[in-house]
């Protein structure tokens, strides 16, 4: 039997790997699972991002669900977190999102959701895979085929976010925010949310267009160079950029400086933990020690997991976590949506900024300082075995290691992580330390150990 799902859902080139027939079968497999679990008329929420192939794949997936006797709520184009929120909001039995997140425009994918909006559990995912390949589908009688209805979730989703922040404090300061939604699903939410919060807003690339004509939807520093200049030139308080499905938010300060995701995650975590009087912060093995400092400051605990937003979300749910996130700008508010939410993150950052009375750059520069370096090596063959060899070498040399995900060598003032990519023939090396010199030294150590491991 083949393997369909990656860390969260399945992705590929639209109409080559992810075809209408493929989406139809996923819909039939998911619907069959829900029917076999004893639900008489399962209800499934389905939505998509702005990709050109989205409508085709959504309609095929819905057809598959209807054929098994599932009722479907089609929410159209919406951010992934809005669809996750809606799945929970409508008390649905499951959800499905047609998205390839930050991938280039020719890609698309499918994510399946639990009733609480979180990504499907591994054991249920395995059943969907088994049904997909065996084609042992439940086919409803002609008079038991599911019904389809359409719902607009954008307004209630925006209202739900507004209810979670201090709108009056924001209106009082009236921040000037420049927004780049990458022609993605966030185009329908973020500019409107910020205006309703009382911000002055200038938006760029904010019309839905699945060709992503303005930039690659991955909101990294390289792709945001032009946007960084716009934020500075307009004299904005800060800028915010999103990826294709709007589950992440990346920030630019008033000087046009790109802010690393773990710094904005730290700002949010600091506020949330303070409001909760402590709690549990969940993040990955690759995130900055800055988050440990923030947790300590607020009397909170830290749990570190493997890399992956769904892994963080599961850990938050299982351990009653307070706040979660990753170094790439993805923040999870578990009592709102059990997944990364770019709009909720932005609303919280706007509130923090408004209440502080400070410049955005000041909020960032007040955080404990760490230096980070990253590099990568193209490696064919069994990358996990090579990373395991790095662990063996490090242990022999007497280093303290953590093998939660890859090989992390831990020092008193920093760390280096050697980790195989789950999607590309690449091994990544990340380092961090309190000084630039040490961070470089740790990166060099990671490179040296990897080279030794590659020699065998």
From Swiss-Prot:
Induction: Up-regulated in the presence of starch. Can also use Ni(2+), Mn(2+) and Zn(2+), to a lesser extent. Homotetramer. The active site is at 101 (phosphoserine intermediate). Catalyzes the interconversion of glucose 1-phosphate and glucose 6-phosphate, and the interconversion of mannose 1-phosphate and mannose 6-phosphate. Also displays low activity with deoxyribose 1-phosphate and glucosamine 1-phosphate. Optimum temperature is 90 degrees Celsius for PGM activity. Mg(2+) binds at residues 101, 243, 245, 247. One of its GO terms (molecular function) is phosphomannomutase activity. It catalyses: alpha-D-glucose 1-phosphate = alpha-D-glucose 6-phosphate; alpha-D-mannose 1-phosphate = D-mannose 6-phosphate. Belongs to the phosphohexose mutase family. Keywords: Isomerase, Magnesium, Metal-binding, Phosphoprotein. Activated by phosphorylation. Optimum pH is 7.0 for PGM activity. Its EC number is 5.4.2.2, 5.4.2.8. Its cofactor is Mg(2+). SUPFAM superfamilies: Phosphoglucomutase, C-terminal domain (SSF55957), Phosphoglucomutase, first 3 domains (SSF53738). It comes from Thermococcus kodakarensis (strain ATCC BAA-918 / JCM 12380 / KOD1). GO terms for biological process: carbohydrate metabolic process. This is Phosphoglucomutase/phosphomannomutase. The modification Phosphoserine is found at residue 101. Gene3D superfamilies: Alpha-D-Glucose-1,6-Bisphosphate, subunit A, domain 3, Alpha-D-phosphohexomutase, C-terminal domain.
